[in-house]
Amino acid sequence: MVMRSWPAPTVVALPDHGGPLSVHDTVTGSRRTITPGATARMYVCGITPYDAAHLGHAFTYLTFDLVNRVWRDAGHTVDYVQNITDIDDPLLERAAATGQDWQELAAREIQVFREDMAALRILPPRAFLGVVESMDLIADFVARLRAQGVTYEVDGDIYFSAADAPGFGSLSQLDRTAMLELFAERGGDPGRAGKKDPLDWLLWRAERPGEPAWDTPLGRGRPGWHVECSAISVHELGMGFDLNGGGDDLIFPHHEMGAAEACCATGSRPQARHYLHVAMVGLDGEKMSKSRGNLVFVSQLRKAGTDPMAIRLALLAHHYRTAWEWTDADLRTAEQRLERWRAAAAVENAPDARPLLARVRSALADDLDTATALAAVDEWADAALSGSGDDPDAPALMRTTVDTLLGVALDR
């Protein structure tokens, strides 16, 4: 199955340009200003297509949509790549448990994801690549690692030797005990017999009875999780791209191990110049996750008649680095805000919106400070609705500011 992205919303250029984006870099643990060239390159890890897309997914992809929008407003072209993990153990397990064909399950969930992203006005990636369609390039990447002497086999499976990765652990800054604990929790196999080190991870899984497998020079099998993203990112963006990101549960092992693979395969570093990770969204006191089953789905909210722009505004009310819990009150507040903004955008004369544009630009450039950006729009809307201001061009500039930078369409 060849992946296709979703339709791109129209993005109207604003007067002048915004400034550079400063974010909290996971590797340094500090604020850093990202300084791309003419083209900003970004890779974001995609979903495993079952139970998609819940609000945790939406919050993550909204965050990187803001990065995309800020970069574009600053005058950059953005080369954005995202994968889809359309073959993986959890997908196969869900298909078996529900009596579905795994390919049909994946195709259905990917289509729902596309529809949700389009409804939320998330700018689509230039390349939206599934693992299945990328099988040859992933197998070639594993072969490159094997040629570098950093792999070994256990019963036909190919493993990466963590001891052969220079600087392993520098991304996550975790000690060995914490690494082993998270590796076991997040899809690793530290207890497998025959491994040289419990932290060594799977690159290629040899064919098992009853499991899908592909013919490659490595033999029949399928890739491990981490190498899928490292292979696709290197193929599409090269090394040293500007930003690698995802949820903060990907810091270790996924991004740590993927970076080690990319650096060893290419002989260069870093894989990415900056790493940005998004906090988790909770429900009923726990992280929203597939394993817990405590999910709120974008598609369900949409089917219930919720305006996708209200969903987007509810997510925008929270900062990407702060974990939070979804409540019905979040949505009610967002719906009220959306109505107020739409009413303000419809007045004939309003206060000058150029200061509003400057404030929203400044807030987003400052580590994606969405709360400050929303407050600035609220203040302008309140003034406009009170009859203040006599600028007939202001409502149009306000609408474009909110649409282009925050991704919120105020047309009904």
UniProtKB/Swiss-Prot annotation:
Q: Which reaction does it catalyse?
A: 1D-myo-inositol 2-amino-2-deoxy-alpha-D-glucopyranoside + L-cysteine + ATP = 1D-myo-inositol 2-(L-cysteinylamino)-2-deoxy-alpha-D-glucopyranoside + AMP + diphosphate + H(+)
Its GO biological process terms? cysteinyl-tRNA aminoacylation; mycothiol biosynthetic process
Q: Which domain of life is it from?
A: Bacteria
Which positions bind Zn(2+)?
Answer: C45, C229, H254
| Motif 'KMSKS' region: chain residues | 287-291
The answer to keyword Nucleotide-binding applying to this record is yes
Q: How is the cofactor bound?
A: Binds 1 zinc ion per subunit.
Record-linked Pfam families: tRNA-synt_1e
Q: Where is this motif: 'HIGH' region?
A: 47-57
| Molecular function terms, GO-annotated | ATP binding; cysteine-glucosaminylinositol ligase activity; cysteine-tRNA ligase activity; zinc ion binding
User: Is-annotated flag, keyword ATP-binding?
Assistant: yes
Query: What's the EC number here?
Result: 6.3.1.13
> Enzyme class, one word?
ligase
Q: Into which family does the record put it?
A: Belongs to the class-I aminoacyl-tRNA synthetase family. MshC subfamily.
Tell me the subunit arrangement. Monomer.
Say what the protein does: Catalyzes the ATP-dependent condensation of GlcN-Ins and L-cysteine to form L-Cys-GlcN-Ins.
Indicate what this protein is called per its UniProt record. L-cysteine:1D-myo-inositol 2-amino-2-deoxy-alpha-D-glucopyranoside ligase
- What species was this sequence derived from? Thermobifida fusca (strain YX)
- Gene name of this polypeptide: mshC
